[in-house]
Regions:
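Active-site glycine-rich loops that stabilize anionic/oxyanionic intermediates
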Residues: 28-32, 97
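Catalytic histidine-centered segment of alpha/beta-hydrolase-like enzymes
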Residues: 244-257
């Protein structure tokens, strides 16, 4: 389905029990909502008991690219615009990597719109100077070599070594999603990541139930970053997902879903 949000068509799915508590799934960069529908994925696990909304961030998946001038603030505007469009007053939000950055800024800006927070393979800190330089190098690489080469390099860094043997279909799916992403969107999103604000100072103000999950082998947003958020967010829960790196929801789906489902069940209706 498509919704017109901030003059951009945003692609989304809205499944499950329409009268149940809504859960919003926000994917990472540079993926799409399909990372949540991978075999026995989160959409399938939650749909029997929840209303599940998973969408493509602008410029990703089947959403419109627009002008390619992206910021995390704009991504938050789109999130709020989408839940307004869907008539959702308050939701549990689940964000992985970039999705986590969006969720953290959204709950900082609009805390009244969220009843729970799930942060996966993400962190509250803004990019360091070193990270910004790496983003700039990635933009140059996309412009020079195109999405296909970028995709090959990217998947090598986000999956645990054992995943390449255990779940080659997951690798293939993510690589194909990246390859189909417009260079303008890849570059615009890299700039958005590099310019995002640091939300660390707001973690102590988060008052909704919060679950944090991270792959034990995540080198991009490591377990130490998850532990720091866990210590800062009052009453938050932390689980380190074994046999997983930065794509913990796809690499160890059973473990990830177990913790997610149990957390959401505790919230009640």
């Amino acid at each position: 389905m498509k919704a017109s949000v901030n003059n951009t068509l945003v692609n989304y799915i809205d499944v499950g029990i329409s009268t149940a508590s809504p859960v919003i799934l926000i994917h990472g960069f540079p993926f799409s909502h399909r990372m949540w529908t991978y075999t026995a994925g989160q959409v399938e696990a939650l749909a029997p008991t929840h209303r599940v909304v998973a969408y493509d961030i602008r410029g990703h998946g089947e959403s419109e690219v627009g002008d390619g001038i992206y910021t995390v603030e704009l991504f938050v505007d789109d999130l709020i615009g989408l839940i307004d469009h869907l008539g959702i007053a308050k939701a549990a939000v689940v964000g992985l990597s970039l999705g986590g950055y969006i969720a953290l800024r959204a709950i900082e800006r609009n805390p009244e719109r969220f009843r729970a927070l799930v942060l996966c393979d993400t962190k509250s800190e803004a990019d360091s100077n070193e990270a910004k330089i790496k983003r700039a190098a990635s933009i140059k690489a996309v412009k020079t070599n195109g999405p296909r080469q970028f995709a090959e390099n990217f998947v090598a860094n986000v999956f645990a070594p054992e995943t390449f043997n255990a779940r080659p279909d997951a690798i293939k799916l993510i690589q194909s999603i990246i390859e189909r992403t417009a260079p303008l969107s890849l570059c615009g999103s890299l700039l958005a990541l590099a310019s995002r604000t640091d939300t660390t100072s707001s973690l102590a103000k988060i008052s909704v139930p919060t679950l944090i999950m991270v792959g034990e082998h995540d080198a991009i947003t490591p377990p130490s970053a998850a532990q720091s958020m866990n210590q800062a967010i009052p009453g938050s829960e932390l689980f380190v997902i074994p046999n997983a790196a930065h794509m913990s929801n796809m690499e160890n789906t059973a473990e990830f879903n177990k913790h997610l489902f149990e957390f959401l069940q505790k919230l009640g209706s």
